[in-house]
């Protein structure tokens, strides 16, 4: 039997005000920032960076995206679980550094 761990490589953007539905976006940063993107907050249980920002639509948004840091954390989990095969689930929004992180893990 083979077990393969699928790693996320995409982003989600949710308006937390205004009653707007969340949407999956295909990039590593939000496209509708009003001002400067604040520093991320690390969500240890999700192993991903989260940003709260004010959008150009006038709503407050919660945005999170997979990146090299989140990939590294999930690869460490794969090691802990003894999983030696991985795959990525992505929609053209991959942080290029994720590939470097995965390649380093694969060489171990």
Please place each PLM-identified region on the residue numbering.
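C-terminal functional modules
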Residues: 75, 89-91
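Glycan-binding loop/region signatures in secreted carbohydrate-active enzymes
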Residues: 2-76, 105-108
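C-terminal helical cap(s) of enzyme catalytic domains, especially alpha/beta-barrels
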Residues: 95-108
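Acidic-and-aromatic substrate-binding clefts and catalytic sites of carbohydrate-active enzymes
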Residues: 12, 91-97
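Loop/turn elements at helix/coil->beta-strand transitions in domains of secreted/extracellular proteins
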Residues: 1-4, 81-86
């Amino acid at each position: 039997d083979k077990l393969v761990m699928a790693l996320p490589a995409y982003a989600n953007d949710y308006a937390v005000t205004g009653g707007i539905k969340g949407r999956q976006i295909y990039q590593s940063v939000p496209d509708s920032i009003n001002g400067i993107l604040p520093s991320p907050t690390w969500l240890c249980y999700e192993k991903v960076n989260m940003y709260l920002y004010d959008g150009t639509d006038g709503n407050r948004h919660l945005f999170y995206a997979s990146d090299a840091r989140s990939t590294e954390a999930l690869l460490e989990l794969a090691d802990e679980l003894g999983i030696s095969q991985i795959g990525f689930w992505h929609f053209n929004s991959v942080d290029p550094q994720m590939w470097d992180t995965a390649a380093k893990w694969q060489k171990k």
